[in-house]
């Protein structure tokens, strides 16, 4: 089980939002590159970056912080980025700068042709982020709820050739209420590409529950508020996941 620390970037700072609300941001660090180094030292094997400003305006906004993170740890572990990625030039630029994966969210829903082109041009580097409330996909920084079912879109994107799906339960994100295991497993069982869980991770019991369904196609989990608030010790969580994987 891949535990992936999230570094959410707003105005060049590392923050956490509550349920995607830009007005409810808690600043955890003014040095995102140092935060990236911290998580690598704690045993992280991949990092998940979100350009929050970029997600809302539809173009990259925290370039300086993102490039600093890539320079700090990008040659040691894969780094993935979502937020404000709406065209092929942006993808190419970020991959050239050293990102391993780009995450397409809103643009995948609104412009499937773009996603298809991205998978053709940059196969192996494209992840789709699907954010949902009650099984329905949301877009535009969670501000708009669509009529699309998560599973329907995910299967379509699998056909396009995406590398993985990050599934976020909006209702649980930043609330420390536990991962929506049932919905995540149901999605993973409906496709052959990996699903990465997101939204609500709160304690070691969640890690236990996730590891129990790893064989169903749930490859990893995004670790957000819990590892910043102290509710979850990241190093201990990764150690537990490794122990469970090895059957000890």
UniProtKB/Swiss-Prot annotation:
Domain of life of the organism encoding this protein: Bacteria
Name of a matching Pfam family: His_biosynth
Bridged cysteine pairs (disulfide): none
Annotated compartments: Cytoplasm
Gene3D superfamilies: Aldolase class I
SUPFAM superfamilies per the UniProt record, alphabetical: Ribulose-phoshate binding barrel (SSF51366)
UniProtKB keywords: Amino-acid biosynthesis, Cytoplasm, Histidine biosynthesis, Isomerase
Keyword Transferase recorded: no
Membrane-spanning segments: none
Top EC group: isomerase
Catalytic activity, as annotated: 1-(5-phospho-beta-D-ribosyl)-5-[(5-phospho-beta-D-ribosylamino)methylideneamino]imidazole-4-carboxamide = 5-[(5-phospho-1-deoxy-D-ribulos-1-ylimino)methylamino]-1-(5-phospho-beta-D-ribosyl)imidazole-4-carboxamide
Record's keyword annotation contains Amino-acid biosynthesis: yes
GO molecular function: 1-(5-phosphoribosyl)-5-[(5-phosphoribosylamino)methylideneamino]imidazole-4-carboxamide isomerase activity
Pathway(s) of this molecule: Amino-acid biosynthesis; L-histidine biosynthesis; L-histidine from 5-phospho-alpha-D-ribose 1-diphosphate: step 4/9
GO CC annotations, alphabetized: cytoplasm
Active site: 8, 131
InterPro entries referenced in this protein's UniProt entry, alphabetically: Aldolase_TIM, His_biosynth, HisA_bact_arch, Isoase_HisA-like, Isoase_HisA-like_bact, RibuloseP-bd_barrel
GO terms, biological process: L-histidine biosynthetic process; L-tryptophan biosynthetic process
EC number: 5.3.1.16
Coiled-coil residue spans: none
Family (UniProt): Belongs to the HisA/HisF family.
Protein name: 1-(5-phosphoribosyl)-5-[(5-phosphoribosylamino)methylideneamino] imidazole-4-carboxamide isomerase
Organism expressing this protein natively: Cupriavidus necator (strain ATCC 17699 / DSM 428 / KCTC 22496 / NCIMB 10442 / H16 / Stanier 337)
Taxon lineage: Bacteria, Pseudomonadati, Pseudomonadota, Betaproteobacteria, Burkholderiales
Gene that specifies this protein: hisA
């Amino acid at each position: 089980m891949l535990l992936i620390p999230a570094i959410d970037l707003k105005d060049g700072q590392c923050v956490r939002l509550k349920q995607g609300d830009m007005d409810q941001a808690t600043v955890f660090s003014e040095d995102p590159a140092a935060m990236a180094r911290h998580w690598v030292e704690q045993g992280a094997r991949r990092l998940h970056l979100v350009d929050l400003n970029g997600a809302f305006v539809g173009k990259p906004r925290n370039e300086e912080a993102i490039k600093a993170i890539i320079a700090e740890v990008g040659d040691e572990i894969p780094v993935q980025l979502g937020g404000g990625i709406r065209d092929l030039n942006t993808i190419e630029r970020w991959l050239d700068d050293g990102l391993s994966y780009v995450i397409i969210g809103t643009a995948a829903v609104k412009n499937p042709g773009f996603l298809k082109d991205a998978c053709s041009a940059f196969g192996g580097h494209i992840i789709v982020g699907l954010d949902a409330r009650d099984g329905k996909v949301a877009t535009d920084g969670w501000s708009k709820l669509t009529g699309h079912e998560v599973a329907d879109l995910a299967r379509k994107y699998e056909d396009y050739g995406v590398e993985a799906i990050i599934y976020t339960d909006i209702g649980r994100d930043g609330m420390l209420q536990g991962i929506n295991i049932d919905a995540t497993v149901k999605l993973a069982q409906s496709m052959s590409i990996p699903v990465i869980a997101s939204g609500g991770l709160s304690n070691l019991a969640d890690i236990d529950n996730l590891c129990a369904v790893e064989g169903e196609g749930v490859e990893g989990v995004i670790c957000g508020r819990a590892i910043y608030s102290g509710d979850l010790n990241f190093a201990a969580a990764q150690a537990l996941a490794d122990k469970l994987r090895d059957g000890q």
